[in-house]
Amino acid sequence: MSNVNTLSALAKSGALSGKRVFIRADLNVPFDDAGRISEDTRIRASVPGIRLALDAGEAVMVTSHLGRPKEGALTEADSLAPVAQRLSELLGMQVRLVPDWVDGVSVEPGEVVLLENCRGNVGEKKDDEGLSRKMAALCDVYVNDAFGTAHRAEATTHGIARFAPVACAGPLLEAELEALGRALHDPKRPLVAIVGGSKVSTKLSILQSLADKVDQLVVGGGIANTFMLAAGLPIGKSLAEPEQVEQARAVIEIMKRRGAEVPIPTDVVCAKSFGADAAATVKAAADVAEDDMILDIGPQTAQRLADILKAAGTIVWNGPVGVFEFDQFAHGTEVVARAIADSAGFSIAGGGDTLAAIAKYGIADQTGYISTGGGAFLEFLEGKALPAVAVLQARAA
């Protein structure tokens, strides 16, 4: 799908031996109050790309951003030092942290060094050409293995790729592009998308883009409440955006004209207040009272969605369908999650809340592909070009 050069193809060809490789990874991991890494999925995900380069006989430089430091003024809290330590453990070899690296790095074939937080460099976020050229001069091969930042044009994700002698995608980025392409460019039908979240306004362009492509567009959370309003149903004091009703109607209309559908809930789970101890009541969608808040889809709607998902050829999942953090409002999301797990179709899931739901119901192994990119995943769904991918495509052309 993505017609880019790949690290795996270069490694196979034997063209990398003795070369200097610069890998832009996504090692932006969370820390606990004691300054320890609390969740290391992203670091573990970067290991195959680093190993591939090492096994091909390269001298390996790796960098990433961490948090949002002030350019030119890194503090101890912004340092990748704990990441270097964790990477050393995972690779079974010492990974040296290099602080000031833009003007030159000494690294030998078979060695891995971690270049300090790239967002500390002045000009990184602006994709500065001078900085990009300096970084490109450090390497023979540039590898982007950070899908999570593919929607940003920064010096380490975009600029350097313009000037490095060779620019390619690492295995993580390659797998991500393949999965997304399989889901949206050449999907097995029926294609079903689930878009949850609180606001139509933040996901409107995604809803509009998907309305042209999918066979069923399932909406959840506050977004579903706005669509219920658009369908003339009462929603009480539920979270919704009345000013987006016309847009919601337009999406329903586009789908209808194509013979596709936005399944509107027929029953819902309501409460009089929002909280872990709120009492849940199941009601028909038409019977929602003025003081009710809709916090989940009802069992009848959940079953209908499960039937749609089980028959799907391809599923794109972004967002829960209810307030699944509270168990009494989690049934809808659980039914949807288990239906995706049981579906024979190919599924791709992305976004923080979605990943939390996958973890809660233990269905990671039954989900076709779990996207590592939040913002990048959403922009891909919108049909936008991702700058970091576009530059690799241009270099491969």
UniProtKB/Swiss-Prot annotation:
PROSITE patterns: PGLYCERATE_KINASE (PS00111). One of its GO terms (molecular function) is ADP binding. One of its GO terms (biological process) is glycolytic process. Pfam families: PGK. Substrate binds at residues 26-28, 42, 65-68, 119, 152. Coiled coil: none annotated. GO terms for cellular component: cytosol. It catalyses: (2R)-3-phosphoglycerate + ATP = (2R)-3-phospho-glyceroyl phosphate + ADP. SUPFAM superfamilies: Phosphoglycerate kinase. Signal peptide: none annotated. Gene3D superfamilies: Phosphoglycerate kinase, N-terminal domain. Its EC number is 2.7.2.3. Pathway: Carbohydrate degradation; glycolysis; pyruvate from D-glyceraldehyde 3-phosphate: step 2/5. This is Phosphoglycerate kinase.
